[in-house]
Structures are given as C-alpha cells and as structure tokens.
C-alpha cells in the first residue's frame, strides 16, 4: 500500500490538506517535499472517492529575520518587518511576491495547483480574528501550554499577539500591554505606543499559536510538515494542546517528512545559500521527475539529491517504472503503479520510446533539429516532426549538459588520428569486416562488439577504450551500442576505415 493511501485509510468525511512556507528566500527543491507530499495526498484522496481540498499557505506576515547572503546590505533596515510589507529585491511588488511568483509558475508546470492563500490576507480580511480573540482571552492557558510542553520560559503579563509598529514597521519589537476587543494596545522598543486592530493585518500571532489558529479557522484536517516541528515539545505538540484545549478542535492528521539533502553540500536552506531553486529543477529535469522523487520515497526517509550523474540514474529509474507500468519491465516495488500514476502529469497510452539518457547523447552528436529528428526516428520515434514533449526533453538535456553534467559525461566527436597497436588494429579491423552484415540496432551492435572482444587478447575495458578514443578522443563515453547506432553505419565505416588507413 502506497504511503498516501496508508495515511488515508481510516479518515472519514471531507478533508482539507494544508501545506505552507515562509517566503524568506528562494523556494527550493528542499521545500518541494512539503507541497508535493500534500499534492500526492490530495490526488490520492480524490482517487479514493474522498471529497478533498488542498491549500498552500504563504506565511508572508513572518518578519525578515536577518540580511541573508543573497540580499544587499541595505535590507538591514527591513529586518523585523513583515515579508509582505518589504519591497522586492528588484523593486517590483513585495519581497514575498518576489520569491513566491516563480514558485507558483513552477508548481503549475508539475501539475500542483493548490489554493494559495496569503497569511497577510487572512489577517487583513479578518479570517483569523475570532481565533485571535479566543487566544487573547485564554492567554494564561496558552502560556502554561507553551511553558509546560514547549519548555518555554514565558513570564509576566503576556499576550499571544505581535502588533506591527506603526512607527518603525517592525513586528518583532512590540509588546502588547492591554487588550479590549478588537484593539490591542502595545509599546515598541523604538519608543512608540499605539493600538492594533486584530481584525486587520495590524499584527499576527506567534507561530506556535498561529498554526493551531489556522487549523481552527481554515478547518484543516491533514497536514504534512518537517520532522523538526514534530519533535518532542515541538510546535506540533504545543499546537495539538492549543487546538484541543483552547479552540476545542481535533488537530489535523500529521505526516512528518524528512529533509532533502543536496549531495556533497548538506541540507538545502535559503538562509545558507545551499539551494537549487525549484524553478531551476524543471529546466534541467523532465517535470515528472521531481514528482517521482517524492512519490516513490516514504516521507520518513531522507533524500540525497544529486543534480549531476545521480539525476540520470533517477530518470533511468523513473523510465523503468514506466515500462513496468505497461508490462514491459519489472521493479522491486509493490506500489510501482501508484508511484507512476502519481508522478505523471498525464497518463500515457504507451511508454515513451526515447529515453532521456539517449537524448543526452543525441544532442551532443547533432547540432540541428533535422539531424536530431532523423536520429530519433532511427531510435523508434514515429512522428515526422519533433513534438512538444520531445522538444522539452531536448532543451532540458542541453541545459543539464551545460549546467550540471560532470566533464566525463560531455563529449564531442573527433576526427583526429590515433595510433593503434597490433591488438587494437585487429579488433578495429574485425569490427569493420562484418559491419555490413549485422542488424543495425543497439543490442546487435553491443553483442557484436562483445563477441569480437571475447576472441581477442585484450581486457574488455581496454578494448572498449579503443572504440571511444577513435570516436571522441578519450577512453570512456556513452553506452557503446547506442552510441555507434546513432552515429550511423556510414559514419562508423568512414571513421574507422580512415584510422586503419592512417595507422597501416
């Protein structure tokens, strides 16, 4: 049973799945685990006949906590200001919109379409005002919950509300000194004293109170979140208590997920600069792959993401799942059909005939689309034009090669002469002798080369190196059968014959 189905097996009634983020910096691949986990639960719920909705909360009332490495020093003046009330780095719109907009474009391209809700709008439109009032009138109980469960040390006359100072604009330097609905009187460290209207975006609740207040106000029933929130005494533990004891609701069904690590660099985090923006991934990877990465891995398992060679291995694995789905291969995963369906933007009638790895090879051989189309057709592609799907794969492969491929995976054809010893000449000569008689297919070529090597005195790796040196000037390269096949019989005969003639 897939992890999403397992989560939903005992739920009843309508479900609202909630996810969210504080848009303090570039929204990256690591952040994608939450929204994709939510989307997968949502789609599985619909498949099971459960009436469900899916929301994504943009926590844009959160303050800017520091000047991050990607910001100019001038942003020091905005530290402590709500993200929705700070100008964008490019001067257009707000800070939060600047980072949210490319993310919205990205998730649309991978078929994730939640209702995106600004937390600022929830405050501004009074959606959270009832919850704020309840919290303010139960502040001692909430203080006791935070102190006893969350190990806080809150003392004195504390209120669960943080006004935005009308003088300096900061939200993290104010303290409420009295409350009389709907106004919270406050003082700020800047010296200003004023009133905040809880029915507007004059302020916000602290996170540990705001989270259960959102569950209450938005009727949230399921929420995936990072394991740090689920630690003992963490925000989910205090949230559960506030939900039941203060708001008189059941907390949402939780699903804790592990982090995504960037291979060789650790946990992805905007504040450290260890990120690959989500918008970047769909430039160097087919859109189904990020969905596949999340769908196939249990949320409790951490993911090591490698945008280099590991990406090709991940795509190979996805394509194997696709072939298994159509009965053409097998995988060691009982949930392979579910994983594949949850990965796809649109279910195909048959598997794609051209692998991404193959396209990575082709785009390094052929520079123009006419030659590419001919090579694709030799590989089983049946259309007389390059359709949008394959064109996207071509563009994606080129981008990946330019930005992320390691040097050993890049190549260009060479016409330089190389010197062969007697054993090497013998292999090349035997290869040419019967090349006109073999079936021109990757498997036939592969087997033909292996037969020749088996009869020679050379080690297989040394023999393969001869072929690669002749073709690309180095000892390793793409899978040889496919590579020779795509270069074409005529090119291979001409190139190998010229080498034999030069070294005769």
Swiss-Prot record:
Gene Ontology terms describing biological process: lysyl-tRNA aminoacylation
Xref: SUPFAM superfamilies: An anticodon-binding domain of class I aminoacyl-tRNA synthetases, Nucleotidylyl transferase
One annotated Gene Ontology cellular component of this protein: cytoplasm
Matches recorded under Pfam families: tRNA-synt_1f
Leading EC class: ligase
Matching NCBIfam families: lysS_arch (TIGR00467)
Stated name of the protein: Lysine--tRNA ligase
Lineage: Archaea, Methanobacteriati, Thermoplasmatota, Thermoplasmata, Thermoplasmatales
């Amino acid at each position: 049973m897939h992890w999403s189905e397992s989560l939903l097996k005992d739920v009843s009634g309508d479900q609202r799945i909630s996810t969210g983020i504080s848009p303090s910096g570039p929204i990256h691949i690591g952040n994608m685990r939450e929204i994709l986990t939510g989307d997968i639960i949502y789609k599985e719920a619909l498949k099971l006949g459960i009436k469900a909705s899916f929301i994504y909360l943009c926590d844009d009332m959160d303050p800017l906590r520091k000047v991050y490495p990607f910001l100019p020093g001038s942003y020091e003046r905005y530290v402590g200001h709500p993200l929705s009330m700070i100008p964008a780095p490019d001067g257009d719109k707000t800070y939060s919109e600047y980072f949210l907009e490319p993310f919205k474009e990205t998730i649309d391209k991978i078929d994730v379409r939640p209702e995106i809700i600004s937390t600022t709008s929830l405050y501004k439109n009074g959606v959270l005002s009832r919850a704020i009032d309840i919290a303010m009138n139960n502040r001692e109980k909430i203080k006791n919950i935070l102190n006893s469960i969350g190990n806080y040390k809150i003392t004195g006359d504390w209120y669960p509300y943080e006004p935005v100072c009308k003088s300096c604009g900061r939200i993290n330097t104010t303290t409420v000194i009295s409350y009389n609905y709907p106004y919270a009187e406050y003082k700020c460290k800047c010296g200003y004293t004023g009133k905040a209207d809880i029915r507007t975006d004059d302020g916000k609740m602290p996170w540990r109170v705001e989270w259960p207040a959102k569950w209450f106000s938005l009727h949230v029933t399921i929420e995936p979140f990072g394991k740090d929130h689920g630690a003992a005494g963490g925000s989910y533990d205090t949230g559960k208590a506030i939900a039941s004891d203060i708001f008189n609701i059941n907390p949402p069904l939780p699903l804790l997920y592990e982090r995504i690590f960037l291979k060789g660099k650790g946990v992805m985090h905007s504040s450290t600069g260890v990120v690959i923006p989500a918008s970047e991934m769909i430039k160097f990877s087919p859109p189904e792959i990020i969905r596949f990465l999340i769908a196939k891995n249990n949320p409790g398992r951490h993911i090591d993401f490698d945008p280099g060679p590991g990406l090709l291995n991940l795509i190979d694995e996805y394509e194997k799942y696709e072939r298994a789905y159509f009965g053409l291969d097998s995988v060691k995963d009982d949930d392979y059909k579910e994983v594949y369906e949850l990965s796809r933007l649109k279910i195909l009638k048959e598997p794609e005939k051209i692998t991404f790895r193959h396209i990575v090879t082709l785009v390094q051989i052929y520079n123009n689309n006419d030659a590419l189309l001919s090579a694709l057709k030799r590989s089983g592609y049946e259309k007389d034009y390059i359709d949008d799907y394959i064109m996207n794969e071509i563009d994606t492969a080129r981008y990946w090669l330019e930005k992320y491929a390691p040097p050993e995976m890049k190549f260009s054809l060479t016409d330089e002469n190389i010197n062969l010893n007697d054993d090497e000449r013998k292999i090349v000569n035997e290869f040419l002798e019967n090349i006109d008689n073999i079936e021109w297919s990757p498997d036939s070529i592969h087997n033909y080369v292996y037969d020749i090597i088996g009869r020679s005195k050379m080690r297989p790796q040394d023999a393969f190196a001869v072929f690669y040196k002749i073709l690309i000037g180095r000892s390793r390269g793409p899978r040889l059968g496919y590579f020779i096949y795509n270069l074409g019989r005529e090119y291979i005969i001409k190139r190998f014959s010229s080498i034999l003639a030069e070294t005769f």
